């Protein structure tokens, strides 16, 4: 049995989120929380929230033992891009892409 949690439209690029997700993929939940608490990146805060939600889903909806859970899947897909323009010299304007991501975490119980 697996429990899933998704955070959509996170205002952070999927590439930056993916770097932190690589740290917790395959780890036990308690170890993943410890890693995220000491990771100095903004994405760690978002992933911590999603992981807490996934553990709560496993505990309440599926009645799984939280001490035996591990991060089975962790990935960030690209969400819609917000396009903004930055004025530059001589009447030019450069486009700035503000990327968003959908963060998904799946936790399973170890056999």
Swiss-Prot record:
- Gene Ontology CC: cytosolic large ribosomal subunit
What exactly does this protein do?
This protein binds specifically to 23S rRNA; its binding is stimulated by other ribosomal proteins, e.g. L4, L17, and L20. It is important during the early stages of 50S assembly. It makes multiple contacts with different domains of the 23S rRNA in the assembled 50S subunit and ribosome. The globular domain of the protein is located near the polypeptide exit tunnel on the outside of the subunit, while an extended beta-hairpin is found that lines the wall of the exit tunnel in the center of the 70S ribosome.
What protein am I looking at? Large ribosomal subunit protein uL22
Q: Which Pfam families match?
A: Ribosomal_L22
**What InterPro entries does the entry give?**
Ribosomal_uL22, Ribosomal_uL22_bac/chlpt-type, Ribosomal_uL22_bac/org-type, Ribosomal_uL22_CS, Ribosomal_uL22_sf
Looking up PROSITE patterns in the UniProt record yields: RIBOSOMAL_L22
Between which residues do disulfide bridges form?
none
Q: What is the lineage of its organism?
A: Bacteria, Bacillati, Bacillota, Clostridia, Eubacteriales
